[in-house]
Amino acid sequence: MVKSKLPYVCGIDAAIDVVGGKWKVLILWALDHGTTRRFADLRRELPGVSEKVLIQQLRELAADEVVHREVFHEVPPHVEYSLTEFGDSLNEALRPLGAWGRRHIKTIEANRRPAEFDIATG
Amino acid sequence: MVKSKLPYVCGIDAAIDVVGGKWKVLILWALDHGTTRRFADLRRELPGVSEKVLIQQLRELAADEVVHREVFHEVPPHVEYSLTEFGDSLNEALRPLGAWGRRHIKTIEANRRPAEFDIATG
DNA sequence: GACCCCACTTACTTCTTGGTAAGTACCCCA
DNA sequence: TGGGGTACTTACCAAGAAGTAAGTGGGGTC
């Protein structure tokens, strides 16, 4: 995702900057409805993400105050990730866009791979 | 902007793929409310965009059936860009996200430049 | 004839993002 | 003592998105 230059010229610009990483909306989705997840849980829920990138995006979301990171100093210690209220409001704002994408996902995919076939290649 | 791998795992993934270029939401905004614009108009309305990137993003939006490109074979010939109905529905779906970004733009900007000052540097 | 506008196209470079793979440090269990 | 789990960090590399700059080919204007 391409970062917009600051200052943002409009709200969408800013919002997409927050949400534009390859795995960020998926992380937001995984933490929806007040869900709490550990680092290793998220790894398992996002097949294909590397540890490096997952941490990177979690840190960025935390820096944006969208995700809350809490360390539990128990034995053994662990870390829990959840949405902040701010993150929750972001997820709400994303819902119409998600619905649009879901509604048109076939069209979008088709336009994105004009060289491929939808039928099985023999 | 980072492209998601196909097939998309959720609608947001797909939508952000359509809208994720650096200038795309700005183009969508410029063409909002049935507005029609020429290439040169858009260049002027998006200060900082290069011709190469503007055309590239217009072509991608057209390939996604979000933007309509019409050539007028008059003398002199020219080209007009406008939103399709599909693009219009996308803009509608983007509005809540835009409102969220606008509401929190100060917070987002502040979190995005922790090393800079908001007061003028002397 | 020189210059501007329109709508691009092309070649080259840089910068950012993400991916790969390995290492760290600590704990528990058998 | 070897293996597994937790939560990272680090270094290196590749792909792609965007930026720069120049060229194209038409027309119209002074």
Identify the residue ranges that each predicted region occupies.
Chain A
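Basic amphipathic alpha-helical segments that dock to polyanions
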Residues: L54, L58-L61
